[in-house]
């Protein structure tokens, strides 16, 4: 929808009617903080006129509304929405999210470069502007078995793709600090380009060394103190509010007009049920303002500061020459979009229907033999046992210990003490490996839940009390090509098929949302007390988030960066 420079100039001067004019609204100027009543003239995908009166070939009355720049999600994994990029686009763009910067490392851990290319191809067909960062840590560490491995030489051919924004979150921060050769090769290859960070709880001189590697942005701060240290050291801090990782309340105190130029908003991992019930970046905006953050600071972080942090200089303001990404709101506090333009296109059913689709990738990716109940035994001859302790609303876990006496060579689950069995089974057809352990925090009294969404290697993860139900749930996912399942009493109570890499559904997001409601209810019937049990389970297998995790190779002490004996 681009227009010639001559057309943009003439329409901006008002010599000819603009392609589209938003009439009689008030623009929230993120430079001055003013609310100014003005028309907004649009030529193709560009804003060409503000602070004046215009006529247009098409005019939309925005009387009583407030116009703000479209929102930018600065870090997310689309796969965590459990739908394809096309359904994600349809789900969030009408809420005002006109740009999203994704790291497709979930699908890349299943099928490698094929997964990244799928996202790059899909991005060309969407209403929103989906930008891709090249996945830096596939797999995230050496302590897991993924479906693929990507080195610097593998990423090099995609570095100059027009939709690529640098290198995605560098999760292997110990590898950076220890100058691991593979890590160093990627950092050197992307030197001078944008490199996104991931350094939970990293402080002091170790943080200095990590930033000195050229890493510019980071989303893992969970306290204001941690975020302020990263700001002081020159990082742009991305405030996160996902379905499990909920850091906005802890960080809202730093979301001030002084700090806003160096702050952004992101969701990281958010499923369609939470998006439908609460929202996306729009939910973060409403929540931050309700908690006392100044609206100017919040809207800057949601657009202008985000654009600046990632080098997207053509957006973030409602001003001539900028991309026509605009959300028309009921109020700044309510942040409910009545109309959204993405690159000058109205984000409505007609726009979504006009998109051309592409074939999905990574079908039939669950390559594991039938699983017997005995596979979930936890052998051992010592009572002293490591236990993963869940912290609700966090992906950081506690490294607990419990006395669990073996019975016939097996340490058994104990629902009275909230000690459930957790198992991770390699499902990429490589080693057939598996590991078992214990987790506290689910509140599970019976049955089992299983998932192939298992960060970041995406092996098959199961939590349960009854071994037969664990096997039933796990084997059901083999038949579904991956997904979620809840089992109890020898029956499958609920399920959701995710056949695209074992990560994404081919169904509309409304159907996925409804299935998640049923899954949550089924999990609660087992006694589960967690608000989002499936994403919480997924993060229990990510060995770059402190303190204790589990992969197909064993229990991982993240602080020592080693597998427990």
UniProtKB/Swiss-Prot annotation:
What Gene3D superfamilies does the record tag this protein with? Metal-dependent hydrolases, Urease, subunit C, domain 1
Task: Indicate the secretion signal residues.
Answer: none
Cofactor names from the entry are: Mn(2+)
Q: What is its EC number?
A: 3.5.4.2
HAMAP family the record matches: Adenine_deamin
Question: What keywords are annotated for this sequence in UniProt?
Answer: Hydrolase, Manganese
Species for this entry: Cereibacter sphaeroides (strain ATCC 17023 / DSM 158 / JCM 6121 / CCUG 31486 / LMG 2827 / NBRC 12203 / NCIMB 8253 / ATH 2.4.1.)
UniProt family annotation = Belongs to the metallo-dependent hydrolases superfamily. Adenine deaminase family.
Q: Which InterPro entries match?
A: Adenine_deam, Adenine_deam_C, Amidohydro-rel, Metal-dep_hydrolase_composite, Metal_Hydrolase
Q: Which SUPFAM superfamilies match?
A: Composite domain of metallo-dependent hydrolases (SSF51338), Metallo-dependent hydrolases (SSF51556)
- Stated name of the protein: Adenine deaminase
Q: Does the keyword Manganese apply?
A: yes
């Amino acid at each position: 929808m681009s227009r010639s420079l001559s057309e943009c100039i003439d329409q901006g001067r008002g010599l000819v009617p603009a392609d589209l004019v938003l009439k009689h609204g008030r623009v929230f100027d993120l430079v001055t903080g003013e609310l100014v009543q003005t028309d907004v003239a649009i030529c193709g995908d560009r804003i060409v006129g503000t602070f004046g009166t215009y006529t247009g070939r098409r005019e939309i009355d925005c009387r009583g509304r407030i116009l703000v720049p479209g929102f930018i999600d600065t870090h997310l994994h689309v796969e965590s929405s459990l739908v394809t990029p096309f359904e994600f686009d349809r789900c969030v763009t009408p809420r005002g999210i006109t740009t999203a910067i994704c790291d497709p490392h979930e699908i890349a851990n299943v099928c490698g470069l094929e997964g990244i290319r799928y996202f790059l191809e899909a991005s060309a067909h969407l209403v929103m502007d989906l930008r891709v960062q090249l996945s830096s840590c596939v797999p995230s560490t050496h302590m897991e078995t993924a479906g693929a491995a990507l080195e610097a030489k593998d990423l090099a051919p995609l570095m100059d793709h027009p939709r690529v924004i640098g290198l995605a979150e560098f999760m292997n921060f110990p590898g950076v600090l220890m100058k691991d050769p593979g890590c160093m090769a990627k950092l050197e290859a992307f030197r001078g380009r944008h490199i996104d960070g991931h350094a939970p709880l990293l402080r002091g001189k170790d943080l200095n060394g990590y930033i000195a590697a050229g890493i510019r942005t980071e989303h893992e701060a969970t306290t204001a103190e941690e975020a302020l240290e990263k700001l002081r050291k020159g990082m742009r801090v991305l405030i996160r509010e996902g379905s499990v990782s909920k850091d906005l309340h802890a960080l809202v105190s730093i979301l001030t007009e002084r700090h806003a130029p160096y702050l952004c908003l992101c969701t990281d991992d958010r499923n369609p049920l939470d998006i439908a019930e609460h929202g996306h970046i729009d939910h973060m905006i409403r929540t931050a303002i309700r908690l006392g953050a100044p609206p100017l600071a919040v809207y800057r972080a949601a657009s202008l500061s985000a654009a600046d942090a990632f080098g997207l200089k053509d957006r973030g303001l409602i001003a001539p020459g900028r991309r026509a990404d605009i959300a028309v709101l009921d109020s700044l506090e309510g942040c409910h979009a009545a109309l959204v333009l993405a690159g000058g296109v109205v984000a409505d059913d007609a726009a979504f229907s006009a998109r051309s689709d592409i074939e999905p990738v990574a079908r039939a990716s669950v390559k594991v033999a039938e699983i017997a109940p005995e596979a979930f035994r936890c052998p051992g001859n010592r009572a002293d046992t490591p236990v993963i302790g869940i912290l609700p609303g966090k992906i950081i876990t506690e490294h607990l210990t419990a006395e669990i006496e073996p019975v016939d060579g097996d340490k058994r689950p104990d629902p009275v003490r909230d000690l459930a069995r957790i198992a991770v089974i390699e499902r990429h057809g490589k080693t057939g490996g598996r590991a078992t352990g214990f987790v506290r925090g689910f509140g599970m009294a019976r049955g089992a839940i299983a998932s192939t969404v298992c960060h970041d290697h995406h092996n098959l993860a199961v939590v349960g009390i009854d071994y037969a139900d664990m096997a039933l749930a796990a084997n059901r996912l083999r038949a579904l090509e991956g997904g979620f399942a809840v089992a109890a009493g020898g029956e499958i109570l609920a399920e959701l098929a995710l056949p695209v890499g074992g990560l994404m559904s081919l169904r509309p997001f409304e159907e996925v949302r409804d299935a998640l409601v049923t899954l949550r209810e089924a999990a609660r019937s087992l006694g589960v007390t967690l608000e989002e049990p499936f994403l919480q389970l997924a993060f229990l297998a990510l060995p770059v988030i402190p303190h204790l995790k589990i992969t197909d190779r064993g229990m991982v002490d993240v602080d020592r960066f080693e597998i427990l004996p």
